[in-house]
Amino acid sequence: MLFGVIVVTCFLLSRSANPVKFFNPTFRQPSEGEGKVKLERILERAATADKTVIVTTLNEAWAAPNSIFDLFLESFHIGNGTTTLLKHLVVVALDCKAYDRCLAVHTHCYLLNTPGTNFSGEAFFMSPIYLRMMWRRIDFLKSLLEMGYNFIFTDTDIMWLRDPFPRFYPDGDFQIACDFFWGKPADLFNQPNGGFNFVKSNNRTVQFYKFWYESRIKYPKLHDQDVFNKIKFDPFLREIGIKVRFLSTAQFSGFCQPSKNLNRVCTMHANCCTGLHKKIHDLKVVLEAWRKFSSTPPKLRASRPISWKIPQKCRL
């Protein structure tokens, strides 16, 4: 199902050089077809030559100035080879204030309509609003695959420090980061984290995402990540032939199992951490450590591993 956009106290026109837009306070919910056309237009502008986009979701709580979203964008600007990736980033706003904030600072913004649900506040882990938000995300990503787009999905509390594309497995259909990685990329006992994944659009991944989304009915009290941990062993995945690969925490890292070597790390996720203020504090520590690392002479970087002292407030 493709979702339309809702226009309630939101700017109507797409992002331009001048962020001041025409404002229309009149409620109007476009049809599903109109929403699909708008989304397709955004995807076409953002996609790479092989129809790949980078996607993140954003709500009001994380969109506020000096909050998670600003740190997320900053990481692209100071990362190694990541600035040019911003032109491929599509920010999917879950409420009007997040949408307005996105339009003020970024190019590709899309407002995802969720009738009867308010996603603007901080969604605490495993709360009913959190579960609805996670499954809404899976359904939306499924629609991108159906439209023929490959994507990297990234949570906004992930700092992009290096271009991840060269680190993906060429044979993987569905590649996912981990809370805990046990050493082998095809080992189903790795503990994945749904906050970062690279998915190629093909019949296998479309079938898989449909199966994943439908499995929420079988496991009504679990979020998408826990449901994935159930279905990754299901014979259906072998039947459709999907190749699942788990990404090493040495490169695609997080606070659960932080990489100790800044010479290798691509991304750093504020996982295993609850509380917005804790995340913000520790992600600022990450960016400051990265700035110091980046200013270190290359010969010194190569001569010994350079690490960082994280997590701090997010410590388990």
Model-predicted regions and their roles:
Residues 7, 198-316:
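Catalytic core and acceptor-binding pocket of nucleotide-sugar-dependent glycosyltransferases
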Residues 38, 53, 67-71, 75, ...:
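Acidic, Ser/Thr-rich intrinsically disordered and amphipathic helical segments
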Residues 111, 132-192, 196-203:
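GT-A fold catalytic core of metal-dependent nucleotide-sugar glycosyltransferases
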Residues 1-68, 73-74, 81-85, 104-108, ...:
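Juxtamembrane luminal stem/stalk of type II transmembrane Golgi/ER carbohydrate-processing enzymes
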Residues 67, 91-147:
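Active-site-proximal specificity loops/subdomain of glycosyltransferases
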Residues 84-90, 150:
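Short active-site oxyanion
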Residues 45-50, 102-104, 144-145, 168-170, ...:
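Extracellular/periplasmic catalytic domains that process cell-envelope and extracellular macromolecules
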